[in-house]
């Protein structure tokens, strides 16, 4: 590697919305993430139902057709 052209790696503090914090090496000093291995359904085995509906469902609900 050429010297002086690569960014420095520093310890990066990663914070998840669930409250879990951990450190990695990165070019940034801090990161915020929405999901991590402590709260993601694949790793926890718990299922979360996030059904927001499509455009047709929103239209039907808006005009009372549902």
Swiss-Prot record:
Transmembrane segments: none annotated. Keywords: Metal-binding, Ribonucleoprotein, Ribosomal protein, RNA-binding, rRNA-binding, Zinc. Binds 1 zinc ion per subunit. InterPro entries: Ribosomal_bL28/bL31-like_sf (IPR034704), Ribosomal_bL31 (IPR002150), Ribosomal_bL31_A (IPR027491), Ribosomal_bL31_sf (IPR042105). The keyword Ligase does not apply. GO terms for molecular function: metal ion binding; rRNA binding; structural constituent of ribosome. Zn(2+) binds at residues 16, 18, 36, 39. Its cofactor is Zn(2+). Pfam families: Ribosomal_L31 (PF01197). Gene3D superfamilies: Ribosomal protein L31. GO terms for cellular component: ribonucleoprotein complex; ribosome. The keyword Metal-binding applies. GO terms for biological process: translation. NCBIfam families: L31, PRK00019.1, PRK00528.1. Part of the 50S ribosomal subunit. Binds the 23S rRNA. Belongs to the bacterial ribosomal protein bL31 family. Type A subfamily. This is Large ribosomal subunit protein bL31. It comes from Nautilia profundicola (strain ATCC BAA-1463 / DSM 18972 / AmH).
């Amino acid at each position: 590697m050429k010297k002086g052209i690569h960014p420095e790696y520093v310890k990066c503090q990663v914070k998840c919305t669930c409250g879990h914090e951990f450190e990695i090496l990165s070019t940034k000093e801090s990161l915020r993430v929405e999901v991590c291995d402590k709260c993601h359904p694949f790793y926890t085995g718990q299922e979360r139902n996030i059904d927001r509906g499509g455009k047709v469902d929103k239209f039907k609900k808006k005009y009372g057709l549902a």
